[in-house]
């Protein structure tokens, strides 16, 4: 009789533990069902880079004075500045400028220290290629402006993920009461563009 009661007690404990483990596992599953997905259907959807995103470098040939400051501040001496000295004007004449993005670490030093602001960071990050030599951009390739994510007709800019409230790290934790929920990036831009602080106050209040 004692062994029988022990078996029943053991069976009840095992059944209780099995139910508890099953509940713990399903609770995680059901908790994620009510969250918005964090994945992106790339390349049909793209994340909107942040304002200070360090993407491909844009170069303006007409502004460059061939001072080579970008080469000196670069940790790996990457930019190649090809220039000749004009004996008549006694000034440098720029012939070619190139950056190999297969080696670039996108630190932004060249952009920060450029005296003429001929270098700037863009939001372009799609630099994949089949040949690594194609990553060596000359002054012509560097001068091309990338297509803005919010204005590219071939893709759908991702909603909401780029406009998380302050203190929220995960995209699915954005409050449902937030004013920006369900709006496209250009609509958010239009909302925040007015000079009055009324809209900005509403957004800040919704984040609290």
UniProtKB/Swiss-Prot annotation:
Q: Where in the cell is it found?
A: Cellular thylakoid membrane
InterPro entries per record: 4Fe4S_Fe-S-bd (IPR017896), 4Fe4S_Fe_S_CS (IPR017900), NADH_quinone_OxRdtase_chainI (IPR010226), NDHI (IPR004497)
Membrane-spanning parts: none
The UniProt catalytic activity note for this protein reads:
a plastoquinone + NADH + (n+1) H(+)(in) = a plastoquinol + NAD(+) + n H(+)(out); a plastoquinone + NADPH + (n+1) H(+)(in) = a plastoquinol + NADP(+) + n H(+)(out)
Q: How is the cofactor bound?
A: Binds 2 [4Fe-4S] clusters per subunit.
Membrane topology term reads:
Peripheral membrane protein
Q: Can you supply a Gene Ontology BP term from the record? A: photosynthesis, light reaction
- Residue ranges annotated for the 4Fe-4S ferredoxin-type domain, each copy included: 55-84, 95-124
Keyword Membrane recorded = yes
Residues the record lists as binding [4Fe-4S] cluster 2:
74, 104, 107, 110
Q: Does the keyword Thylakoid apply?
A: yes
Q: What is its EC number?
A: 7.1.1.-
- Annotated residues that bind [4Fe-4S] cluster 1 are located at 64, 67, 70, 114
Co-factor(s): [4Fe-4S] cluster
Q: Which UniProt keywords apply?
A: 4Fe-4S, Iron, Iron-sulfur, Membrane, Metal-binding, NAD, NADP, Plastoquinone, Quinone, Repeat, Thylakoid, Translocase
Membership in a protein family: Belongs to the complex I 23 kDa subunit family.
Self-association and partners = NDH-1 is composed of at least 11 different subunits.
Q: Known PANTHER family for this protein? A: NAD(P)H-QUINONE OXIDOREDUCTASE SUBUNIT I, CHLOROPLASTIC
HAMAP family cross-referenced by the UniProt entry: NDH1_NuoI
Protein's name according to its UniProt entry: NAD(P)H-quinone oxidoreductase subunit I
What high-level taxonomic lineage is stated for the organism?
Bacteria, Bacillati, Cyanobacteriota, Cyanophyceae, Synechococcales
* Gene (name only): ndhI
């Amino acid at each position: 009789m004692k062994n029988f009661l022990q078996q029943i007690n053991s069976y009840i404990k095992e059944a209780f533990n099995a139910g508890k483990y099953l509940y713990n596992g399903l609770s995680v599953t059901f908790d994620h069902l009510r969250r918005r997905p964090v994945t992106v259907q790339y390349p049909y959807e793209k994340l909107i880079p942040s304002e200070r995103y360090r993407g491909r470098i844009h170069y303006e040939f007409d502004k460059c004075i061939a001072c080579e400051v970008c080469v000196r501040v670069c940790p790996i001496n990457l930019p190649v500045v090809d220039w000749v000295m004009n004996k008549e004007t006694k000034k440098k004449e720029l012939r070619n400028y190139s950056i190999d993005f297969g080696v670039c670490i996108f630190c932004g030093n060249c952009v920060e220290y450029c005296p003429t602001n001929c270098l700037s960071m863009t939001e372009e990050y799609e630099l994949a290629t089949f040949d690594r030599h194609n990553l060596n951009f000359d002054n012509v390739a560097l001068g091309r402006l990338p297509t803005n994510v919010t204005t590219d007709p071939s893709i759908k800019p991702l909603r909401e993920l780029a406009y998380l409230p302050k203190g929220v790290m995960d995209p699915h934790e954005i409050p449902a009461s937030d004013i920006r929920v369900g709006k496209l990036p250009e609509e958010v831009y239009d909302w925040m563009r007015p000079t009055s602080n009324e809209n900005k106050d509403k957004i800040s209040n919704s984040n609290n």
